[in-house]
């Protein structure tokens, strides 16, 4: 669980366990962060996995959710910051890319309204 936090080297070690010890390894985790960038461990896992089963989530609009949006206490989408925040108070919402992009644009437009 939380395989996105593994290092690429740890993923390589898991692959060695599968190949050398003939032990099946199952990993679960996110592909991308709140900025839609791959986690390094997730990228390596996808490169080496024998199979990948996607667990789908749904955006509030009904489309397939593909973005893990980080939000603050006021419900605003956070677009900058560290990829991993330990002990952070931020929350996350699964959104489709369209809704995520529209919400960011809406927030940007509000900055220019006086």
Residue ranges and their predicted role:
Residues 1:
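Gly/Thr-rich phosphate-binding loop signature of adenosyl cofactor/nucleotide-binding cores
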């Amino acid at each position: 669980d939380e395989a996105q936090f593994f290092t690429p080297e740890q993923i390589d070690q898991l692959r060695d366990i599968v190949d050398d010890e003939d032990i099946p390894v199952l990993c679960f985790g996110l592909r991308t962060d709140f900025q839609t960038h791959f986690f390094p461990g997730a990228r390596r896992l996808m490169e080496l996995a024998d199979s990948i089963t996607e667990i789908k989530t749904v955006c509030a609009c009904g489309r397939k959710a593909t973005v893990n949006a980080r939000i603050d206490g006021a419900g605003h989408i956070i677009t900058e910051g560290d990829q991993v925040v330990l002990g952070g108070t931020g929350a996350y919402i699964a959104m489709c890319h369209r809704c995520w992009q529209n919400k960011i644009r809406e927030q940007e437009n509000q900055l220019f309204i006086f």
